[in-house]
Amino acid sequence: MESFSSKSLALQAEKKLLSKMAGRSVAHLFIDETSSEVLDELYRVSKEYTHSRSKAQRVIKDLIKVAVKVAVLHRSGCFSPGELALATRFRQKLRQGAMTALSFGEVDFTFEAAVLAGLLIECREILLELVEHHLTPKSHDRIRHVFDHYSDPDLLTALYGPDFTQHLDKICDGLRKLLDEGKL
């Protein structure tokens, strides 16, 4: 007997459509204003660090695609109880990373690239495990691309250095607001 699920087909179509439209207009459906400001600042950091507009756009586009797809999966109730526990663990680890990034930004001479990179790598692994059975290998590669980019110790060291102070301050302001509002 043929196994057919209209829900599965609709979800597949939704993910396919969203993957083709990962621009700002679609992102605003899933990403609030503060998150959007943080993403814009992360784009600026990536662009200045890599000296490449296209590389910076690619990493942010990948980040948005992954965030939207995970949001669609979550809102559609696609995660099993075990996967929901992984999602909770991911959120806690991401929150820990945000608080660590804030602490490093607020207290002089406390920054350690290895600590922040380690937290981001843990987030990557948890997220990959969470979406293992739901997203394509191409989406898994996007996750690796985003987390590998932002967990690069050289990029993190530059971000916490004097040349990126303005960007770091804006990122920290956004992270603080997201934490205060319980969105992170």
Curated annotation (Swiss-Prot):
Post-translational modification: Phosphorylated by TAK1/MAP3K7; this phosphorylation triggers association with BTRC and subsequent ubiquitination and degradation.
InterPro entries: TNFAIP8-like (IPR008477), TNFAIP8_sf (IPR038355)
Location of this chain's protein in the cell: Cytoplasm; Nucleus; Lysosome
Lineage: Eukaryota, Metazoa, Chordata, Craniata, Vertebrata
Subunit structure: May interact with CASP8; however, such result is unclear since could not reproduce the interaction with CASP8. Interacts with RAC1.
Residues modified as Phosphoserine: S3
Keyword terms of this UniProt record: Cytoplasm, Immunity, Innate immunity, Lysosome, Nucleus, Phosphoprotein, Ubl conjugation
Species of the source: Rattus norvegicus (Rat)
Pfam family for this entry, one: DUF758
Highest taxon of source: Eukaryota
The protein, known as: Tumor necrosis factor alpha-induced protein 8-like protein 2
Primary site of residence: cytoplasm
Domain notes: The central region was initially thought to constitute a DED (death effector) domain. However, 3D-structure data reveal a previously uncharacterized fold that is different from the predicted fold of a DED (death effector) domain. It consists of a large, hydrophobic central cavity that is poised for cofactor binding.
